[in-house]
Amino acid sequence: MLGIDTNVLVRFLVRDDQTQFKKARKLLKREVSNGRRVFINQLVLLETEWVLRSRYGLAKTLMLDTISRLLDAPDIQLEDEPAVEEALFIWRDANADFADCLIGARNGRFGCRATVTFDTKASKLSGFTAA
């Protein structure tokens, strides 16, 4: 398995730099053709979501679709996929950020009875409590 950094994933998804896109695609194809999966940890996933939303202006619906496609890709392994799936489910109808949804999902999976926050939007999510 080969882990990838945010810039490789963003270049692969956005394709705005053809040289880097081709390098990323070649690297990913090589791994897959050798029977290996590509690993995306949650820090990379969160940073990618932030970059695509803030720098490229991708709408939430496109982000939901993009992350769902990564989850469904047989050659990609996301860190703690059940937490990512839960976060996506929550995020669909929430005003909070994806990061907050993932924080809540992860904390719940680790047995936390609640997540305390100063974030008004996040405090409205199930499993969160306002500080």
Give the location of each predicted region.
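Acidic, PIN/NYN-like endoribonuclease modules and their adjacent C-terminal/linker elements
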Residues: M1, G104-A131
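Short, well-structured N-terminal submotif of metal-dependent ribonuclease cores
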Residues: M1-I40, R55-L62, S68
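Histidine- and aromatic-rich ligand-binding microenvironments
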Residues: D5, N41, A96-D97, D119-T120
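Alpha-helix capping/helix-boundary segments
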Residues: V8, V44, A83, L102-I103, ...
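Acidic catalytic patch
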Residues: D16, Q42-V44, D65-D93
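Short active-site oxyanion
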Residues: G35-V38, D75, G111-A114
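A mid-sequence interfacial segment
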Residues: A83-R113
